[in-house]
């Protein structure tokens, strides 16, 4: 089962409570990047292209706890970089569990065998192992041969030790629906508790700029994949059925970037997990000081092809709460994989992209250099 009954009940109660209180914007999952340092250099990743002085930064345990206290989300997803490079990661996970949060710890599994004894199985804790398809697909995606076998070994080890274990799979242009469906069958046989799948986002700093999916290609790809698995019912996904329905082109959704806010070494990232257009010092500043109407499909050029879960899963969850009847046909027959697509959001009036990455890097480097000797954070990586 991808989501435990306890998690479904707790998160559902939280969402309903927010609506009853009349809150228009609220966080569902805290996205935490406690460091950018990684032991891979994936072709489609735009998260690690920083100078060493920034790659060596990390969030302290106290900063990580402060982030969840500020935003109050019921779930935390810890990414990076590679989180297992963070020396204090076991303490961070324990701190979130002590606060009764549901924790997803993302990893490429290269260090999992070495680190797994530092963690204890808990129904509220899940490993999320990066696996972008079968052996050829995944090794090409991460630009290192042999990583697929290590990820599969990590899945088997985690399951043997009694951990809840899921995979996170990002798909790019050129992905073949038949191969992806066969891959989903294979990881299901491995006993994973769930699959998180999403199209890749076109990071401006990613090394490979040629293989990101357009919205049209995303919809066709997911219809092809899901049609080979009984509308997706053959597999256990961690995401809302309505989000999968959206990926298949059957829903017209605007994104809710505040539903999965990101805290990283720069601060609270504006406006979302994918776009670093600015940074706030506090969660409240992020929520109150971001002009949300400036971002999203049809509003901003960088958002044009985005269909990623960190922007649209929150929308799908809200839709399932406010219009629960939409879930019934999905439960009965799965995602519709034929017929016309739902209308898409027009792009005619989107504002042009602004490129601010270099400015943010320069400002962060200046901040690091201005610190007094002896006040530098400890090295992030081992």
Residue ranges of model-derived segments:
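Generic structural signal for helix capping and beta-alpha/helix-loop junctions
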Residues: 52, 85, 113, 136, ...
């Amino acid at each position: 089962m991808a989501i435990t009954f306890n998690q479904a009940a707790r998160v559902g109660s939280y969402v309903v409570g927010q609506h009853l209180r009349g809150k228009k914007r609220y966080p569902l999952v805290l996205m935490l990047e406690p460091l950018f340092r990684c032991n891979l250099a994936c072709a489609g990743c735009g998260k690690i292209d920083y100078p060493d002085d920034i790659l060596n930064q990390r969030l302290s345990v106290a900063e990580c706890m402060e982030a969840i206290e500020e935003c109050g989300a019921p779930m935390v997803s810890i990414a990076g970089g590679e989180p297992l490079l963070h020396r204090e990661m076991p303490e961070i996970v324990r701190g979130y569990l002590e606060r009764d949060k549901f924790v997803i710890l993302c990893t490429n599994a290269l260090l999992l065998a070495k680190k797994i004894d530092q963690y204890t199985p808990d129904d509220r804790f899940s490993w999320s192992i990066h696996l972008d398809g079968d052996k050829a697909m995944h090794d090409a995606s991460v630009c290192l041969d042999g990583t697929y076998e290590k990820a599969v070994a990590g899945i088997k080890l985690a399951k043997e030790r009694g951990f809840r274990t899921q995979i996170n799979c990002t798909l790019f242009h050129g992905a073949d629906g038949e191969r992806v469906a066969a891959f989903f069958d294979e990881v299901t046989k491995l006993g994973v508790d769930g699959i998180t799948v999403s199209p890749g986002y076109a990071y401006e700093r990613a090394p490979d700029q040629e293989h990101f999916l357009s919205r049209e290609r995303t919809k066709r790809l997911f219809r092809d994949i899901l049609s080979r698995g009984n509308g997706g019912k053959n597999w256990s996904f961690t995401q809302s059925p309505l989000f999968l329905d959206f990926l298949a082109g059957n829903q017209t959704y605007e994104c809710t970037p505040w539903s999965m806010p990101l805290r990283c070494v720069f601060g609270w990232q504006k406006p979302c997990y994918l776009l670093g257009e600015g940074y706030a010092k506090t969660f409240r500043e992020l929520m109150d000081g971001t002009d949300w109407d400036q971002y999203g499909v049809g509003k901003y050029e960088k958002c044009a092809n985005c269909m990623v879960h960190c922007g649209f899963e929150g929308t799908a969850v809200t839709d399932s709460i406010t219009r629960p009847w939409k879930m019934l046909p999905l439960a009965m027959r799965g995602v519709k994989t034929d017929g016309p697509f739902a209308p898409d959001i027009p792009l005619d009036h989107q504002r042009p992209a602004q490129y601010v990455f270099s400015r943010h890097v320069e400002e962060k480097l200046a901040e690091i250099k201005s610190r007094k000797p002896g006040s530098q954070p400890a090295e992030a990586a081992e």
